[in-house]
Amino acid sequence: MRNKVYIGVDFGGTKILTGAMTNEGKIIGEPVKVSTDSNDTSEKIFKKVTDSVEHVIQQIDMKNFEVDGIGMGVTGPIDIRNGVILECPQLPTMHFFPLKRKVKDFFSLPVYMNNDANCLIYGEALYGSGAGLNSVVGFTLGTGIGCAIVMDNKILNGSTDSAAEIWPSPYLDGTIEDYVSGSGVSKIYREICVQEESDSKSSLEIAMLAEKGDTNALKTWDEFGRHLAVAVSWTINLIDPNIIILGGSIANAFKFFSSSMEKNLRKQICPTPAEKTKIVCAKLGPNAGFIGAAALAVNKV
């Protein structure tokens, strides 16, 4: 009897990363990465998806393995139940594209789909920093802020597939995403330095300055940690998870904002989780997205 293997597709706005794994999270073969372009037609993008899946399948020893399903983590917003991309600002030709049905018809395999942020955290919850825990909340910190909730090995989607979408929540003079995101880090730095927007630096540049001991950069990350603590406190007080996982490019600067975040967070949450809830970084690296997507197929969700 052949062992089952599952394909995961991490479908982002600029790239598609596809890989295969077992139900235990062991990666089979080499993941395949292809770039996408905003000028690509929907047909061209769909072909990139199918080509990458086929390339991954070709690496699998079919004498010992059989493909049991495909999971996709897709940039959105998306209609999870029907498997349709509703809107994709970076790939406008994919608006209202029925990706799940198209992939299912092409490969004649079961296909499962969720949004990319959910899948990244799902991978971490099952096989990464949250493995073995039954209640996980994760944040993806990059260009924007994403949030996902995993309970009893299932993603909490909500009645309209919008659970944990905290980015538009009102905060100070705007939304929480205005402060807890890559653009938020740049905004904080500009205000500390009293710079014009044209002189703005990216979060990566500000992290590099902090590495060199730049005072304004260090102040920026300290302030960012204070704002992040607010977002994290909302979810802890509401969900009471075992653990909070931070992923995305900004999490790479964890050492610069962790102290400020922890100090402010513990004051804003209930006493028991204040003592027990851990905040950790994601550990699966760039493969987390396709691992979480493949896990959709493993668990048939």
Name each model feature, range by range.
Residues I85-H95:
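A charged helix-plus-loop insertion that forms the helical arch/lid used to bind
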Residues D10, G71-T75, N114, G138-G144, ...:
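Short beta-strand segments
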Residues A131-S183:
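Glycine-rich phosphate-binding loop of actin/hexokinase-like ATP-binding domains
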Residues M1-G69, I78-V84, R101-V111, L126-L133, ...:
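ATP-binding/phosphotransfer module of carbohydrate and carboxylate kinases, centering on a glycine-rich
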Residues V32-K33, Q90, T160:
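Short clusters of small/polar residues that mark proteolytic maturation junctions
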Residues Q90-P92, Y112-N118, G138-L141, V280-P286:
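Active-site nucleophile and cofactor-binding loops and adjacent substrate-binding regions
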Residues S35-D37, T93-M94, A163-E165:
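A short acidic/small-residue loop/turn micro-motif
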Residues L120-L126, I149, S169:
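Adenylate-forming
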